[in-house]
Structures are given as C-alpha cells and as structure tokens.
C-alpha cells in the first residue's frame, strides 16, 4: 500500500509504478501519501527488514535493545511482519513496524507497533494498523488482540479497538 504524506490528510497514491512498487516492496504493498510532508509511504509485508535498521527504529521509540538474533527468531515465528517505509527510489527508509503472532487461522496478536517519533501524529500509525488488519482478515483471522502501553491506549480506542475491563480475561507471566 502506498500513501503520500500531505498534512493530516492521508490519501491513497499511485505515484509509484506497479512494477517499481512490486520490485522494491513486493506484492500486496500499499502506497499512500500524507499531505503536510509531501512524502510517499509504503506499507508492505513482503519487503525484507534490515535487522540493524529495525533495531535503530525501535531505539528511536525508546524501547530497550534486544539481541538481534532473538529479534530474527521472533520475526521468523511471526505470522505477519509489516514494515512502513518512507519511499525513496534507491534507499527506502524504515519508519514504522509491527508484527503479529498467532495460530494463523482464527486468532492473532499484534506486537511491537512502532512509528519513528519524527513521523508520529501524521496518521501513519493508523494506516499501518489498517494494513495489518486487512492482511489478517485476508488470511481468515477474525479475532485480533494487542497489548498497548497506557500512553497509547487512546490511539487504539480512536481506531475502534475495544478495551477489555482490567483483569477480566487477561493473565500475564514474566520471567525474572
């Protein structure tokens, strides 16, 4: 999926030729634009992620560093891995990311949603989540959950996510 960054307005874009889009980002990519920055962005599940670039993105959002080989294993065991790139003909830049785990048939959980702070507040996270939900629906998954930090819960509520009452159905275990 491709989109152009044009202020608070996100609109589908056809700025990149179909061949170039498939060549750079793979099949089923989504191109869009965001009007304020006049930049083109692409969501894709098929473009390979550079693990160093992903680590740098996660550092910019303030997450603790994870060993690269463990990140690779987590990606390998995910049912969906999505990158959000600022388009450039030669060097697309990873500015967003999310992954999903699950049984691949009935249920999935969205993890590690991240958008570079420079690009937050422009509607890119919303487009990333729309793309993820569309792709999960395409493989037949009808129940999706996610865990979010308190400071971003309102973002998900605005996207139509329903919050579960505290403690009613969730239990957590953390290794020491």
Stretches found by the model and what they are:
Residues 106, 142, 162:
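Short acidic/polar active-site loop segments enriched in Thr and Asp
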């Amino acid at each position: 999926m491709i989109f152009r960054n044009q202020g608070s307005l996100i609109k589908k874009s056809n700025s990149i030729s179909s061949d170039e889009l498939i060549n750079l980002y793979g099949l089923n990519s989504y191109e869009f634009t965001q009007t304020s920055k006049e930049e083109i962005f692409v969501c894709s599940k098929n473009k390979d992620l550079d693990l160093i670039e992903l680590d740098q993105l996660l550092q910019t959002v303030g997450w603790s560093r994870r060993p690269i080989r463990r990140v690779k294993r987590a990606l390998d065991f995910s049912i969906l891995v999505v990158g959000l790139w600022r388009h450039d003909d030669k060097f697309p830049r990873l500015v967003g990311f999310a992954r999903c785990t699950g049984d691949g048939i009935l249920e999935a959980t969205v993890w590690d949603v991240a958008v570079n702070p420079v690009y937050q507040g422009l509607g890119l996270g919303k487009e990333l989540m729309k793309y993820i939900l569309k792709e999960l629906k395409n493989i037949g998954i009808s129940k999706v959950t996610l865990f979010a930090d308190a400071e971003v819960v309102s973002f998900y509520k605005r996207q139509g996510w329903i919050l579960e009452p505290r403690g009613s159905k969730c239990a957590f275990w953390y290794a020491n």
